[in-house]
Regions:
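Enzyme catalytic cores with a strong preference for nitrogen-chemistry domains
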Residues: 1-334, 344-356, 361, 370, ...
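ATP/NTP-dependent adenylation/nucleotidyl-transfer catalytic domains that generate, transfer
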Residues: 171, 236-237, 248, 266, ...
Length: 693
């Protein structure tokens, strides 16, 4: 009977001393309860997302120093510790010429490292280095594949099972690092190679150990269970999966780590699972290879998507960790009365005391009494600070100033008969550029020039602001003037309340509602915003904190008479349909290959075949949303152009967001600012449809 423990610690990226102390506390506890094997996550000393800090040799040296201290902690005990850390080879270089580094897994026992005499290093080297989405491990690490090729060895010789001594006798583990278990689309299968290598030597593996740094996304735990359950049955071996909690970021995307460490028996059953987002050490007994799964009880209603409770926990946990990490104590939220600001306020209210939360309503003449009352109700229900700061006067002042101050067009000075000596290296410089260069260097450059001055008089023009320009001024006045000013006054920060649907097509104003220190719901689709609001009222608050009116009112920016919510006027989006369409653009669908995002050609061909409802997962036929093929095509082209147009520039300048989906904006989705592209097949399909309608 082996007692193992999951060291599901909170990992602070780049903070070696703090992570070391967390590990030592876990080690002390594991010793106190007579643990045989304590398992920590991947790169638990350094953190996974530390950017190019990996290039700094002193940082690497400190990683190795603390790793040695962990090894020493096993001296004079019966405790074996498995932990992730960087490994190096001082005599070799990475492909970029930097110090050779490995994403490594160490096994320590009796004060020293446990290794296989046939392995080249006293640690296990990660083989599959992900280089997709926001992952880019080959930037810093060398894989076991390269080591095998350098040494002219089979990959199976590089990483092998390890046998440790326990109070119950010899115990053999197969150490695996994160992606090395997710090998479906790779040519190499590290776990299979290790198991087959053991069989070839008549060696029995008692436990497969996967140490991961695996961030939360919607449905991620279901995917983990499916993978490890299948592998446990395939290899007829229990699997211990260990992950950490905390948040880490690459600047634009903030990853939330949920932990959810788990033990799987040979039947693939989940026999132990550490609760999500808990910084804890969880001991468990591995008595034999077969366990009985424990029953679970669901509190969800049929109308609540199954992932919503965990999504709420992830966002709440992310907010708490991000505020602690940045030291921000006071939060300012623009409360419009709509659902987005209401949900954001509700989320922050579960983390902050009410005295640290400021809700600000900033009405103009276009805001209805209904939404103003809803903003007031929200603040009253939360019990936080509330202020009303009308923007009409400020907006009118800005508009009046912009339309009353003239622009003067000066006459253009032109040059003719220009003869100058241009060095060969400067042959590509345009004439206008060389004119400027020569005029500023008349004492050193030989040239002759005849100057002509345009005799036209100066002209004066005045700006005439469009309705759209005036709408954007309102949004910028709210964020850049009022919210930023209040945040500065209370020594806090103001939020961006945007959602993923809006970000997809740029339905937001730069330096306006797109501003803020963090977009908590920036990776949450609008329909899920509503689902989260209903869930929080029913299960978290158990009362109506988010006013029902904010859930029921038509979504609207209320920036003009054309967006009058009292007349049922609002956003130009049918969220039930457009969420499904935009998700296909950004993430793909459950019916496509991983990372296969759909184009207008895919959408239109499915429409032509009558399969679009199935492809997008629509709850109604397409005819419910559009009355004609023409209308459907115009809508598709409008939003595809928006998605690939100015919306890209807006997303580049948007605040950081929590990554919770299959594909988030930021570094998770690499984007260039290009002209919207329509495939040739799209034009052919479009012609057929329009001819036949």
């Amino acid at each position: 009977m082996i007692r193992i423990a999951f060291g599901q610690i909170q990992v602070h990226p780049g903070d070696l001393a703090t992570n070391f102390q967390s590990m030592m506390h876990a080690i002390d506890y594991a010793k106190a309860v007579s643990t045989d094997i304590l398992i920590f996550p991947e790169l638990c000393l350094s953190g996974y997302m530390v950017g190019d800090l990996w290039d700094q040799v002193p940082f690497i040296n400190d990683c190795l120093y603390y790793g040695d201290e962990i090894v020493k902690a096993t001296a004079n005990t019966n405790l074996t510790i498995i932990f992730g850390n960087v490994g190096i080879d001082e005599h070799l270089r990475n492909l970029d010429g930097s110090l050779r580094k490995y994403n490594a897994l160490y096994v320590a026992s009796k004060g020293q490292l446990v290794s296989n005499p046939f392995q080249p290093y006293p640690f296990t080297i990660k083989t599959l280095l992900p280089c997709y989405r926001y992952f880019n491990e080959p930037r810093h690490f060398t894989s076991a594949n390269i080591v095998a090729k350098e040494r002219n060895l089979p990959l199976s010789d590089i990483n092998q099972p390890l046998t440790i001594s326990t109070r119950q006798g010899a115990f053999t583990i197969a150490p695996v690092i994160c992606e090395d278990s997710w090998d479906t689309h790779y040519p190499d299968c590290p776990t299979s190679l290790m198991v087959e290598s053991a069989k070839a030597k008549s060696q029995h593996i008692d436990l497969i150990v996967n140490c991961s740094s695996s961030p939360y996304t919607i449905h991620k735990q279901e995917q983990r269970h499916a993978l490890f359950s299948a592998q446990a049955k395939q290899y007829n071996t229990p699997i211990a999966y260990t992950n950490h909690v905390g948040i880490q970021n690459n600047g634009k995307n903030i990853c939330i780590y949920d932990g959810c460490s788990a033990l799987y028996d040979v039947n693939g059953s989940v026999v132990e699972e550490v609760p999500a987002f808990e910084n804890t050490v969880r001991p468990t007994l591995l008595k034999d290879t077969v366990w009985q799964p424990q029953p679970t009880v669901s509190l969800q209603t049929e109308s609540t998507p199954t992932y919503i409770p965990t999504l709420f926990k992830a966002l709440q946990y992310g907010i708490r960790q991000f505020l602690a990490q940045t030291g921000i104590k006071n939060i300012v939220i623009g409360a419009s009365g709509g659902i987005d600001s209401a949900l954001n306020a509700a989320l922050y209210s579960t983390v902050l005391p009410p005295e640290n939360l400021y809700l600000v309503n900033m009405p103009s003449r276009y805001n209805s009494d209904m939404t103003k009352d809803l903003a007031y109700q929200l603040a009253h229900n939360i019990g936080c600070h509330y202020g009303v700061f009308p923007i009409e006067e400020g907006v009118n002042t800005t508009v009046a100033q912009l339309e009353s101050q003239p622009f003067t067009k000066f006459p253009l000075k032109t040059s003719s008969h220009v003869h100058k000596h241009i060095p060969a290296d400067d042959a590509t410089i345009s004439n206008s550029t060389t004119d400027t260069i020569c005029e500023s260097q008349q004492t050193t450059t030989n040239h002759t020039e005849q100057t002509h001055v345009d005799t036209d008089l100066d002209t004066t023009t005045f700006l005439q602001l469009s309705t759209l320009a005036k709408e954007n001024i309102q949004a910028r006045d709210r964020s850049s003037r009022i919210l930023a000013g209040i945040a500065s006054a209370v020594n806090g920060a103001f939020t961006c309340n945007g959602n993923k649907t809006e970000f997809t097509v740029g339905y937001a104003t730069m330096y306006g509602d797109l501003a803020g220190f963090l977009a908590v719901t920036g990776d949450v689709w609008k329909t899920d915003v509503y689902a989260l609001a209903r869930y929080m009222n029913e299960y978290i608050f158990k009362r109506e904190v988010i006013p029902q009116g904010s859930i029921d009112v038509v979504p609207s920016a209320e920036l003009s008479d054309a967006q009058d919510v009292t007349q049922g006027l609002g956003d130009p989006l049918q969220y039930e349909y457009h969420d499904c369409l935009f998700r296909a653009f950004v993430e793909g669908t459950p019916h496509t290959l991983p990372h296969q995002r759909l184009t207008p050609e895919d959408i239109l061909c499915a429409y032509e075949k009558g399969t679009l409802e199935h492809l997008l997962g629509l709850s109604h036929p397409v005819s419910h949303y559009f009355t004609s093929t023409d209308q459907f095509i115009n809508d598709l082209e409008r939003w595809w152009k928006s998605f690939n147009g100015l919306a890209v520039a807006k997303r580049i300048q948007s605040p950081p967001l929590f990554l919770v989906s299959e594909r988030a904006f930021g570094t998770d989705l690499s984007e260039s600012q290009l002209k919207p592209y329509f495939p040739r097949g799209y034009e052919a399909c479009k012609s057929r449809l329009l001819q036949n309608q």
